[in-house]
Structure formats: structure tokens, C-alpha cells
């Protein structure tokens, strides 16, 4: 069996991140899977001539990239905004989704409070720049007990964040603010869904996720204490094992 015929797992990063966030996470993955990572539009090295940052445009880009790699179906493992992209992808290309991991992500749209917060963040970026924004944005995404313990990882994310173009930061914030409710995608899902949830997540609360667990036909969940919005660093071994076990279910 050649590597290209192995079951495909596609990892999608979040806002202000890049494909590099998955490097450590995927290093000890078992053989027998084809692991793919992408830079979403405007992120990492994928920064040239981007005009549309919407979740739908990102989903079309993902579909195009999978087709170029001759991937007909994949398990999507998606952090935060990557999950919003994956839900838009699953809405349009359900036949290409073997399974879905919502890694600190949600099918709900922004609340009014969250939308107002996006506007404040955009205003801050326009006035003070991306570098200043990332200095204050990333730290609270870790659970309080992990903020100093995982200093190296925090600085790694801040470096990626600072390198993200201002147009991307503004475009992605606007796109996330305007994304629709996609709970119907979960309700109609013919594929299994794994929710990975941090109990200390300030971006996606446990309370908002619990009702979503009941929506898919087959739902799995990992709820983690002392974890914020960055479980792939905060509980790397546990979350990696959860994804490996889930891949076994999806492709078993």
C-alpha cells in the first residue's frame, strides 16, 4: 500500500496560526495514515493575492487542495477557526468528509457580545498593529495554570501571529463575525464527530458545546480540565491519543 492510498487526515489550523502548529502534534502519529496540513488563505506562507477570507472561500480552497492531492475523503481535524472552515466544507462537500474533529470549535455563530468583541479587536489592530494585538490576544487562550508553564509554546504562537498580515487578521475577524449558524451541518452529519473541549476555554465555552454533542448521529467528546483553547499544546498526549483513537473508529 503506498502512502498516497492510506486514509487521509487533514489538519486545519486556527485564526492567526499556520500549519506549523501541527508539527509536534503529528510527529508521533502511527503509520498507516496520510497526514496533510495546509496554510489557510492569508496564513503562513499562503498570503499572496487573497481577496476573500470567508469560511466559504476557505472551504473551496480546502476542496481544491484535496483534489490536487487526489484525496476523495478525509478525516478533518480542525482547531478553532479551522473548525468553522470545516463546517462550511462539510455543508458544501459532505461526501468528502469521513469524520470531523472540532478541536475547541463550534457550529454556533458569534453571539452579539462576541461580534462586538470582534469589532473591538479590529479597531485595536487598525490603531496599534498586529504585533501589539498578538501580545495580548494569545496569552488568555491558555488556561491560567499553563500560561507560564508553556512559555515556549506561547512565544511560538505569538511569533506565528505577529507574522500574519494585517489584511488577514482584519479579514478573518470580519469573516468569523459574519459566519452563519451551522448546527444543521452537525444535525445532518452522516460522519462521526469528535468534540475536544477545554473547560477553561475563554473562546468556546463548555456550556455552549454541550447541547451540540446531541446533534450528530454519532458523537464523541473529550472534556478536559485545566485546558483552555490550545489543547494540542496544553494536553498534547491526551488529545493526540483521542484523535488517533477516533481515526481508528472513522476508518476502522
Role assignments for model-derived ranges:
Residues 6-14:
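Short beta-strand element of the alpha/beta-hydrolase
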Residues 14-17, 80:
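Active-site glycine-rich loops that stabilize anionic/oxyanionic intermediates
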Residues 6, 23-77, 92-93, 238-243:
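Active-site loop/oxyanion-hole signature of alpha/beta-hydrolase fold enzymes
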Amino acid at each position: 500500500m503506498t502512502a498516497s492510498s492510506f486514509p487521509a487526515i487533514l489538519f486545519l489550523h486556527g485564526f492567526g496560526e499556520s500549519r506549523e502548529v501541527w508539527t509536534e502534534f503529528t510527529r508521533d502519529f502511527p503509520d498507516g495514515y496520510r497526514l496533510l496540513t495546509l496554510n489557510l488563505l492569508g496564513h503562513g506562507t499562503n498570503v499572496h493575492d487573497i481577496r476573500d477570507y470567508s469560511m466559504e472561500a476557505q472551504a473551496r480552497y480546502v476542496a481544491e487542495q484535496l483534489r490536487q492531492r487526489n484525496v476523495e475523503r478525509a478525516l478533518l481535524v480542525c482547531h478553532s477557526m479551522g473548525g468553522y472552515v470545516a463546517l462550511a466544507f462539510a455543508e458544501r462537500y459532505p461526501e468528502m468528509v469521513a469524520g470531523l474533529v472540532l478541536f475547541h470549535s463550534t457550529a454556533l455563530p458569534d453571539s452579539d457580545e462576541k461580534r462586538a468583541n470582534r469589532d473591538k479587536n479590529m479597531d485595536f489592530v487598525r490603531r496599534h498593529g498586529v504585533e501589539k494585538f498578538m501580545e495580548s490576544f494569545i496569552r488568555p487562550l491558555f488556561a491560567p495554570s499553563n500560561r507560564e508553564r508553556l512559555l515556549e509554546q506561547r512565544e511560538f504562537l505569538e511569533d506565528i501571529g505577529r507574522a500574519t498580515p494585517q489584511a488577514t487578521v482584519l479579514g478573518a475577524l470580519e469573516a468569523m463575525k459574519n459566519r452563519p449558524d451551522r448546527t444543521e451541518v452537525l444535525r445532518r452529519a452522516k460522519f462521526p464527530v469528535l468534540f475536544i473541549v477545554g473547560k477553561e476555554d475563554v473562546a468556546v465555552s463548555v456550556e455552549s458545546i454541550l447541547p451540540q454533542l446531541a446533534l450528530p448521529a454519532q458523537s464523541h467528546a473529550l472534556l478536559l480540565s485545566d485546558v483552555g483553547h490550545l489543547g494540542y499544546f496544553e494536553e498534547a498526549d491526551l488529545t493526540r491519543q483521542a484523535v488517533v483513537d477516533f481515526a481508528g473508529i472513522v476508518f476502522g
